[in-house]
Amino acid sequence: MKRYILFLIASFVAISVSAQRITHDFRDVSMSKALKMIEANTSKYKINFIYNELEDFTVTTSIDKKTVPDAIRDVIGFYPIRMTVDGDNIFVECIQKENTKLIGEVIDKRGQPIVYANISLLSAKDSTFINGGVSNLAGKFVIPCSAKHALVKVSCIGYKTILRAFDAGDIGKIIMTEDMQVIKGVIVKGHRPIFKHEENKIIFDINQMQKIENLTSKDVLKFAPGVIINSNGEIKMAGKKATVFVNGRQLSDEEQSAFMTNLKASEISKIELSQNHG
């Protein structure tokens, strides 16, 4: 049986590479500090950003011999932050200009970080979607939010979904409990990580899921970190419309709708999620 690879990307500006390489382990440092550290290790680029705009976003990632643009891509991750390049200047800005943010940390009962959990902010009045984000390698998340109060939905494969009301600001730690039974009876095998970070993308290993025979690709995508599927079927990632590739070929909107409905989950070998392509 032919198997497919789905590749989703959020819009991003193509960047030329530099001979300079960055190697560093970032452990729970602010985005502002991470960018300053990268800038200190390059003589080619000046990195421009508004300090207070990015200070609340925290970075936990390891960078090994990356170009300056690629290093910045890694520290940005799936935050709603955009990078553009103009000659020797790199501009980094948050694309969601809200005065308040929802800040927190997702952990298990042993205190270990839960990586790539989906966090959705819903209206406290009617549960409509406001904004969303993904926990990073330290289990932490920062989501710009215009609402002072919101319902916070936290979900991750293998854990019980949490739905609680919070005020905007730092809500502290959210503890999730394990639950091998997930939507529609799908079971996670648990032998290998179902999500894996490679270069500038997240690999969603469909082979680590059982009982998916009756699911479509659309059903499985609902498990993917940072992916939101609107009621009209539009796929968004990191707050932006996602471009969908199947085995390297970009799908039109019409093809995308057909694939999401007709392509069975069992026909997919893996899903790749990225904020850039090429």
Predicted region positions:
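Short Pro-Gly-centered beta-turn/loop motif in secreted/extracellular proteins
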Residues: 112-114, 142-150, 166, 212, ...
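Short, acidic Ser/Thr/Gly-rich low-complexity loop/linker segments typical of extracellular
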Residues: 125-140
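Bacterial Sec-dependent N-terminal signal peptides
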Residues: 1-26, 34-38, 119, 151, ...
